[in-house]
């Protein structure tokens, strides 16, 4: 409980959005320990949003990054791609995850891997998030949720009036554009190193 209290004290929220922002922060930090949606809602989300499996072609996408530049999966053909989905810009868990990737970025580059973050936040939100945390990789805006849904990472928590947000899922995509590894509902802390270790195994 002390840990969660510290988490929420670190979040800046408006009075009108206090409850929703607090819940997003909890979900963003907690990873697999996040509060689960009711079974019926989870089933409905799963039915509408099915993740591609290892060996399948990664769904194509074209999204704007924090600078407004359009990025597509095809741009990275011939490279490994780490495509990670996260719930919301600026929340504690999402910031931790992004900053750990930032600190490991040279290791990803040595592994011939591009890192792309995705959430449903708008481009202006991405810009602030990237600038505040000096992120040296693209964070992409999926406001239509099309890409998040294509990768099976779309979820909702109707009991908290939170709809169509990204779950913390990560996909490693090989240089031929196929899914090599999928992580679902991961812990933010330590995930960057886990992905680097998996990349090393896949590249042997």
Language-model segment annotations:
Residues 93-147:
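Structural microenvironment flanking redox-active thiols in thiol-disulfide oxidoreductases
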Residues 164-204:
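Thiol-/selenol-based redox modules, centered on thioredoxin-like
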Residues 12-33:
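Bacterial N-terminal signal peptides
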Residues 50-55, 61-80:
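A short beta-strand-turn-helix
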Residues 74-95:
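Short active-site neighborhood of thiol/selenol oxidoreductases, capturing the structured segment around
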Residues 1-12:
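N-terminal secretory signal peptides that target proteins for export/translocation
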Residues 27-28, 32-60:
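N-proximal helix/coil linker or "cap" segments that precede and/or mark the start of modular domains
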């Amino acid at each position: 409980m002390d840990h969660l209290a510290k988490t929420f004290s670190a979040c800046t929220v408006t009075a009108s959005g206090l409850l929703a922002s607090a819940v997003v922060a909890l979900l963003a930090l907690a990873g697999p320990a996040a509060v689960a949606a009711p079974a019926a809602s989870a089933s409905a989300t799963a039915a509408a949003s099915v993740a591609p499996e290892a060996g399948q072609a990664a769904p194509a996408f074209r999204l704007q990054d924090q600078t407004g530049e359009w990025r597509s999966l095809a741009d990275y053909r011939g490279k490994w791609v780490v495509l990670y989905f996260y719930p919301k810009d600026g929340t504690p868990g999402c910031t931790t995850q992004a900053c750990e990737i930032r600190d490991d970025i040279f290791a990803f580059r040595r592994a011939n891997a591009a890192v792309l973050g995705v959430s449903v936040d708008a481009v202006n939100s991405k810009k602030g998030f990237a600038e505040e945390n000096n992120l040296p990789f693209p964070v992409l805006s999926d406001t239509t949720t099309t890409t998040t849904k294509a990768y099976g990472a779309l979820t909702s928590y109707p009991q908290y009036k939170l709809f169509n947000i990204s779950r913390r899922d990560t996909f490693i995509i090989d240089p031929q554009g196929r899914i090599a590894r999928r992580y679902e509902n991961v812990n933010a802390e330590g995930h960057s190193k886990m992905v680097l270790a998996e990349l090393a195994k896949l590249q042997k």
